[in-house]
Amino acid sequence: MVVVLAGCSAPSGTGSPAKAEETVVLGLGSEPDTLDPVLGYAADGGSLLYDGLVRRTPALDLQPALAEALPDVEGTEVTFKLRQGVTFHDGRPLTGADVAYTYTQVLKAANNSPIRGDYAAIDRVDAPDARTVVFRLKYPYAPILQRATLGIVPAGSGLTSGSAAPVGTGPYAFVSWTKGDKITLRANDRYWGGAPAVKKVVLAYTADDNARATRMAAGEFTAAELPPKAVARFRNQQGTTVHEAPTADYRGVMFPLGRPVTGDLAIRRALSLAVDRAAMVTAILAGAGTPAYGPVAPGTPWHNPAVAGPGTPDRDAAVRLLEEAGWKAGADGVRAKDGTPARFTLMYPAGDSLRKELALAVASDAKRVGIDIRLAGLDWDAIEPRMGEDALMMGYGTPFDPDYLNYELFHSSFAGQGFLNPGRYRDPEVDRALETGRETSDPAARKRAYDEFQQRISDDAVWLYLVYLKHTYVVRGDWSGLTVGVEPHEHATGGLFGTVANWKPAP
């Protein structure tokens, strides 16, 4: 990401701030579908509108937010005491009933919440009094506090997938949402954590990376997220600073496993041998990243180092593997097996220059071993219905507990549910490992389970993991309060942008 803060002109329609330090315009690439936590908005705590019972520090430690202290998590009952004096943006006091309502709405099957599976360990949430909330679990669940970052909404709130005014307890309150353009927020001067110095925040959305960089250079944004190569022109620009954040955010190719070519293990393994990950880091990420071989980031305690691949491609080994599996080279250089050419389509979101460049690199490397990859840059509405048929350059990743994302991406019960397990992967051993990791509280047993999970999906080459990114931010002006920490894939108003309530012009 890139964050730029200053007294520059506002984008069209945002209005000109009276004082630069009172208004910040953040240039973002991805607009949310909803601002409702029940429907998955910023469930991991990356929101300016909402608070959870707990929140994460930049170092990923958990600390109390709406809860007054971190509770004991032994057993199947976890009790939170709420912080006193907290009010919603509309003035209503926060009570235990609001917390119970929020989680109950997520768990209610009729609401079809996309994050419902994340809270499968919770049987119910009760509020015995105004300041007490009790999570009653189906089994001891080690990362339950990690799930307590969910933003809390007032009891009785309806699902707001459109632009209806959301209400939370966070440092900023909702003002307006112009779909396809911007969301405007105002400071919550009654915020329990202290009134923000920045009084107005505009989240300005531009999906195309190059267009967003151009708007940043033109001074339309006081902050913007950009891919690593796009920040190069800002590095030596007077008055701007580039910030790099370490992440668990990976890019890789999701294979539809029910198709003749991508469903062939030899094809998938050969591609993993053929691609030059180090070259991608150098040429595409401008050095702002590392090679990736799996969904659990190196350097995290849950990473299995046994799944790390070679530092350089081995295309001779890839060719041998394909030959032994019956994929023979044709006159046109494209391999075929039983009359089926080694050819498939790789989709990527059209406005994402980073994914486009990675897709081009994969296709180029694949061609060298006789695999023909056709590229298709599409919008997300066109991509989603094709995920069972065509490969996709995807991005995911979280530095939090390994139960996050991995269960939904690889457990067979989620096969084919939109962007959850889109490749329709089914493996009983992986299911058992993920279930053990989720339902066991013993750290050593969980580590063994997640090591087994990582090894199994590596052996199956379920995805072609390519790179872990650094999020790059550009900041114009001299500001205090900007804090960089380890970031997940979903970082919009989390990460560096999530600290905007602490930003102050440096004296």
Where is each model-derived feature located?
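Ligand-site clamp/hinge motif
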Residues: 160, 188-234, 364, 372-374
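Gly/Pro-rich hinge or "lid" segments in bacterial periplasmic/extracellular proteins
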Residues: 146-196, 200, 210, 315, ...
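Detector for C-terminal structural segments
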Residues: 178, 275-304, 354-363, 384-507
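Ligand/substrate-recognition segments at binding pockets and active sites
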Residues: 328-399
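Aromatic- and charge-enriched surface segment that lines or borders ligand/interaction sites
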Residues: 68-112, 261-263
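Structural transition elements
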Residues: 291-330, 350-355
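Surface-exposed binding/hinge segments that line
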Residues: 115-157, 176
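N-terminal lobe/hinge region of extracytoplasmic solute-binding protein
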Residues: 27-74, 104, 167-168
